[in-house]
């Protein structure tokens, strides 16, 4: 929530209503707790949109790194009963669909990223993935790329992916493959690559961060204009 404060504050300054969502984290809470929280948050925001002078139909989402993974699962499976278990009277009648999504250096293929971490000796990523999913069956099931590969009936909101090419956490093959699969499935996706930028590059002020911000603002403006 605080890591992308610089980026989100700049988006808010452009006139967008920004809500920063907390969700449960591993290892204390394994998958799908994180997606449950985000699913509830989008429904709560729709229920209370008028309080923020926002329209329920214009609410999108953004997520960075593992938050991008959580975002995409919530966006692609807005009505999945595994994710909609949290409820309250005020959210009844509101769905979990997203008008658009912005995924910042996201984990779009959790299983492929796990195999990459093992092969390259990234023990921290291996451990965090195991803590998150607990087993490889869950890793395959809770996998945005897997949803597309299995030809599941998925929601495909307009999507902007922001990815640095020097990201040691995310090999470029993953976002490139996902973008191709998303298009084939009928989704509208823009993959923007930032040469020599590392993981979480938008957390620091730079020309690349400025460019990413302008791309994000233009992307949202296009979605709200339709």
List each model region and its residues.
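Alpha/beta-hydrolase active-site loop
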Residues: 29-51
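Primarily recognizes the serine-hydrolase "nucleophile elbow" in alpha/beta-hydrolase
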Residues: 43-116
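Mobile cap/lid helix-loop segments that gate and shape the active-site cleft of serine hydrolases
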Residues: 76, 83-84, 88, 112-150
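Short beta-strand/loop motif that positions the catalytic acidic residue
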Residues: 155, 160-163, 167
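Conserved alpha/beta-hydrolase "acid-adjacent" motif
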Residues: 168-177
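Catalytic histidine-centered segment of alpha/beta-hydrolase-like enzymes
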Residues: 197-209
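Catalytic active-site module of serine/aspartate enzymes centered on a nucleophile-bearing elbow/loop
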Residues: 207-226
């Amino acid at each position: 929530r605080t890591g992308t404060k610089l980026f989100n504050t700049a988006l808010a300054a452009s006139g967008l209503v920004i809500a920063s969502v907390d969700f449960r984290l591993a290892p204390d809470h394994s998958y799908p707790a994180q997606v449950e929280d985000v699913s509830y948050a989008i429904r709560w925001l729709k229920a209370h949109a008028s309080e923020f002078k926002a329209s329920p139909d214009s609410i999108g989402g953004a997520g960075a790194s593992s938050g991008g993974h959580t975002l995409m699962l919530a966006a692609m499976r807005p009505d999945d009963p595994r994710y909609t278990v949290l409820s309250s009277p005020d959210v009844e009648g509101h769905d979990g669909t997203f008008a658009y999504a912005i995924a910042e250096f996201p984990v779009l293929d959790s299983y492929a990223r796990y195999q990459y971490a093992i092969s390259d000796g990234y023990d921290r990523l291996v451990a965090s993935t195991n803590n998150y999913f607990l087993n490889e069956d869950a890793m395959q099931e809770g996998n945005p790329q897997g949803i597309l590969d299995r030809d599941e009936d998925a929601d495909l909101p307009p999507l902007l992916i922001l990815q640095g090419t020097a990201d040691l956490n995310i090999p470029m093959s993953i976002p490139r493959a996902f973008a191709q699969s998303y298009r084939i499935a009928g989704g509208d996706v823009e993959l923007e690559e930032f040469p020599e930028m590392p993981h979480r590059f938008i957390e620091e002020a730079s020309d690349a961060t400025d460019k990413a911000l302008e791309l994000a603002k233009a992307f949202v403006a296009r979605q709200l204009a339709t």
